[in-house]
Amino acid sequence: MKFGKKNEIQINPLKYNFALIGESGIGKTTVIKEYCEKLAGEDGYIFLEVGKEDGASAISGINYITCPEWDADYDEDTNTMGFNTFIEDVVENKATDWKDLKVVVLDTYDEIFSIGEQEVIRMHNKENPQKRAKSINGCFGGYGAGLEKTIEIVLNALWSLKTVGVSFIVIGHTKSKNIIDPVTGEEYVQLTSNMTQKYFNAIKTKVHFLGVAAIDREIIRKSTGKKDNKGNDIKKGIVQGESRWITFRDDSYTIDSKSRFADIVDRIPLNADALIKALTDAIKAAAIKSGADIKILEEIQAKADQAKAQQVAEAEKAHKSQKELDIAIGEIVDFFTKNKTDIEIIKPILAKCKEMGYSNPKEISDLDDAKTILAMTLK
């Protein structure tokens, strides 16, 4: 028997994992909001303002939820919810409550690991009450095990979104870092993520596109009107002008960017239209190289999306039915436990179970049967 299938490139940029990092206040959140609205519509995206991130409060019309911790029910007054709680709700209710959702934006990625570490500490202390940890380095045996566990729970949460057809975009911050070239031994400065390298690499290896937003400043040397002790004019750098760019490829490796699509442009202006065009053109170029017809490919993928939505809806319905069945069986078992010494009460219910083909209530596999039995316990 033959296994596997031939991959077909998907043209829609939202089908791919994307990360955008840049300095604070450069406009990352605004650009990604506009990018999502143009590709997914106003109801097709949502921002998760994670931890202490607060960028959405300054952007009019943005769809967002604040996620200050890992698990917490939704609070309508504060518009807050646990990060993982939100993810689980989307996965469980995609076909109903979240039917239009296509992409979740995590703002910022570094804050996700902050709340993830607190969850890992909680998990460790629950499993090891006699050897409690106060920091991530003391969790699960130490030696980096706590960091690995944090990466595991974060990536598991993100990948669960993909199982129901929802992609993710991550936003992060940057810093300048001194790097030593492994071949020449020379040191150079690279613009990269400001988070722990292990955490950054965990997502860098998973995304298809990593863009780095930065300001390109034109600086000129201008006289101050003063002279030094040798009589020379003292000059200082003046910013003549500046422009904001997203870099996807940098041959000098001074910008820590990435693309899995070979034909991506090196850099683009920091705006949504340029971003959409750059990603779409790179994806289409890869598809054309493989001999695909773009129009036919789009039609095939539209049908595949419909089939995926139907599959998710059926799985969601089955999951909810099973959940309802489990709850009903639990209540029936509780009833039998409380009344196990009163044979007159439980005898007719046991008889009904046997009539339905079950030797005991725990064997009930049909929701309607469970509802019938449960109704008898309430009389």
Feature-to-residue mapping (PLM):
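Conserved GTP-binding G-domain of TRAFAC-class P-loop NTPases and closely related GTPase folds
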Residues: 180-315
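Conserved nucleotide-sensing/catalytic segment adjacent to the nucleotide-binding pocket
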Residues: 56-129
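P-loop NTPase motor core
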Residues: 108-198
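Interfaces that engage single-stranded nucleic acids at replication/repair/recombination sites
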Residues: 2-22, 26, 37, 46, ...
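Conserved nucleotide-binding/hydrolysis micro-motifs of P-loop NTPases
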Residues: 51-55, 109-111, 174-178, 216-219, ...
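Walker A/P-loop
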Residues: 29
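Short glycine-/polar-rich loops that comprise or flank the Walker A/P-loop
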Residues: 42-44, 164-166, 205-209
